[in-house]
UniProtKB/Swiss-Prot annotation:
One GO term of the biological process aspect: cell morphogenesis
Family assignment from sequence similarity: Belongs to the GARIN family.
Phosphoserine carried by residues: S592
InterPro entries documented for this protein: GARIL-like_Rab2B-bd
Function: May be involved in RNA biogenesis.
Xref: Pfam families: GARIL_Rab2_bd
Keyword Phosphoprotein: yes
Region Disordered: start-end pairs: 234-265, 407-529
Gene name as annotated: GARIN3
Name of the molecule in the record: Golgi-associated RAB2 interactor protein 3
Compartments, as annotated in UniProt: Golgi apparatus; Nucleus, Cajal body
GO cellular component: Cajal body; Golgi apparatus; nucleus; sperm head
Bias (Low complexity): 239-265
Length: 605
């Protein structure tokens, strides 16, 4: 009786899901059945072949001038699993290698050489990705969860089938079904698919969940737990990590296939998931609540019927605010139907920080019923400004504070300093400098006219007293310069050169005297006109003690008056909409206000 008929539970011939397992027992399976240390592999169907290890270029890796032979076996450890779940690797033992020469002589005598294998790796297929590296050279590529990659080339014996690599290709296709896009959820087929194919693909995708990426990053605790016999037997994984609890159950073909839940009391987290219907309806719901993180809820529902696909997704996240913390809330919903292809999305966001709140709302709709329509609406509301929050409780809205900044009060003449931009400040400075030049020119003109008038009066006095005290005026250099012409004109009994000089200076003094009289008359008229204008301006101007300064002495008086030349103002309106929200509307014009300092100086003549 063969070994195949001795299998009491089930054999590879009774495994109807895959034809690759309908083969005779190999060396590894026979060894595990006869004297294996793992009872779980004793009655499990296995598909095995011999490979040699190569590199990526296809070159054979030689270790000590010998080829490394590897036996790869794909095992299904439980009859309730639709697909195999474990990959085993074995290699010849050292004792077997030492007796290779003896095996050659034994083979010549008609006896088969004894070949002993030892298991070196036991890997769940969840953490191994098998792919075809080279079809012509019959090479496979193994990508482990740790990131390591191995390349194997099929090395069949002489008595094996020629199409052995075709079975490996079919097995790789079953373990890695081609899907449109990889996702973390199981692949759901339409209702027209056969029940067996639907079952196989869904289970394969469940086993391949999280292993679609090339990086293959997994936690060490997951890898260690998955290598246990409980996982290999299809009983699932139950482990605790970082104070969390999770549970999973294998999927079956009956309605209400799987129900799982996880809860964590310390963090206030609860997760629940259900799968109903003939592998077409899935519902997942989760919630996490904590005083620090708030609450979060996500729900997903997908149902497939004849000619109709419906998907709904809703989520919400809330963060509880503290004294100086902000709070945000968002909500969204989406609905897709194959009949009319409609989509709806609603979202809201709110932020509150010490009296400042912002809210937004949007909606979009898309429908395909021989027409296309879309709509969106949004609003932003701001209640307070940052300046009012720093200074104290707010009295008015944001625009009211802007209205009171940047202009001078007409009552007290004081100017409230704001913080304008650099460009506006430079323009204002240039205007002030330009306007400050004109009063300085006028005051210098008045001072020059007064000095010339006093000089002419002094010249007249000096002319009258030049005959009496001509020698007394020769003590200082300044008096000589100012009174030179009068002294020369007073010497009537000099030389011929002096007489000619006397005549020329006499004429010049007469002309200058006449011009001085004309200029003095015109200057007095201009001064009278300007004095009348200044008096009218002073009457119209509201002078305050803080803006006017007077310096008096026995012979002069100085007045400093501040005049408003420009004004800056911003007008705004604040209206309340429905719901108590304040809406700000800015209207009016904006002008600038500046002041100019005018200096009046009066001296006694």
């Amino acid at each position: 009786m063969s070994n195949e008929s001795c299998l009491p539970y089930y054999t590879a011939h009774s495994y109807s899901s895959m034809s690759a397992f309908k083969t005779s027992m190999g060396d590894l399976q026979r060894q595990l059945y006869n004297r294996g240390e793992y009872n779980i592999f004793k009655y499990a169907p296995m598909f095995e072949s011999n490979f040699i290890q190569i590199n990526k270029k296809g070159e054979v890796i030689d270790v000590h001038n010998r080829v490394r032979m590897v036996t790869v076996g794909i095992v299904c450890t439980s009859p309730i699993l639709p697909l195999p779940d474990v990959m085993v690797l074995a290699q010849p033992t050292k004792i077997c290698e030492q007796h290779v020469r003896w095996g050659r002589f034994a083979k010549g005598r008609g006896r088969r050489p004894v070949k002993t294998l030892e298991l070196t790796r036991l890997l769940p297929l969840k953490f191994v990705k098998i792919s075809i590296h080279d079809h012509e050279k019959q090479q496979l590529r193994l990508k482990l969860a740790t990131g390591r990659t191995f390349y194997l080339q099929l090395c069949p014996s002489s008595d094996t089938r020629e199409d052995l690599f075709c079975y490996w290709e079919k097995l790789v296709y079953l373990l890695r079904p081609p899907v449109e896009s990889y996702c973390s959820t199981p692949t759901l087929l339409s209702g027209d698919a056969p029940p067996e194919d639907n079952k196989s693909l869904v289970a394969a995708e469940l086993h391949r969940e999280g292993d679609q990426s090339e990086t293959g990053l997994y936690k060490p605790c997951d890898v260690s737990a998955a290598t246990s016999s409980a996982y290999a037997g299809g009983e699932g994984i139950q482990h605790a990590s970082h104070g969390t609890a999770s549970a999973a159950s294998p999927s079956t073909s009956t309605p209400g296939a799987a129900e799982g839940g996880a809860a964590r009391t310390a963090g206030g987290m609860a997760v629940a998931g259900t799968a109903t219907g003939p592998r077409t309806d899935v519902a997942i719901a989760g919630a996490a609540m904590s005083p620090a993180t708030g609450a979060m809820s996500i729900a997903t529902t997908k149902s497939a019927g004849p000619g109709q696909v419906t998907t709904a997704l809703a989520g919400a996240a809330i963060k509880n605010p503290g004294e100086n913390e902000s709070s945000k809330s968002m909500a969204g919903a989406a609905n897709i139907s194959s009949e009319g292809i409609s989509l709806a999305l609603v979202g809201a966001a709110s932020t509150s920080l010490e009296g400042t709140s912002t809210s937004m709302a949007g909606a979009a709709s898309l429908s395909q019923d021989s027409s296309l329509s879309a709509a969106f609406a949004g609003s932003i509301t701001t209640s307070k400004c940052a300046a009012e929050r720093t200074e104290g409780p707010a009295v008015g809205p944001l625009i009211s504070t802007l209205q009171s900044e940047g202009y001078m009060s007409e009552r007290d003449g004081s100017q409230k300093v704001s913080q304008p931009s650099a460009e506006v400040w430079n323009e204002n400075k240039e205007r002030r400098e330009k306007k400050d030049r004109h009063p300085s020119r006028k005051s210098s003109h008045h001072r020059k006219a007064g000095e010339s008038h006093r000089r002419r009066a002094g010249d007249k006095n000096q002319k009258a007293s030049s005959h009496r005290s001509a020698s007394g005026h020769k003590n200082t250099r300044d008096d000589k310069k100012e009174k030179g012409y009068s002294n020369v004109r007073g010497k009537r009994h000099g030389s011929s050169r002096k007489s000619s000089t006397h005549s020329s200076t006499k004429k010049e003094s007469r002309t200058t005297q006449e011009l001085g009289k004309n200029q003095s008359a015109s200057s007095t008229g201009a001064l009278q006109k300007k004095a009348s204008k200044i008096s009218s301006f002073l009457r119209s101007l509201r002078a305050t003690p803080g803006s006017k300064t007077r310096v008096t002495s026995h012979d002069r008086e100085v007045d400093i008056v501040a005049k408003m030349v420009e004004k800056q103002n911003i007008e705004a309106k604040v209206e309340k909409a429905q719901g108590g929200q304040e809406l700000e509307m800015i209207s009016g014009t904006m002008t600038s206000e500046k002041t100019e300092m005018i200096v009046f100086e009066t001296k006694s003549i």
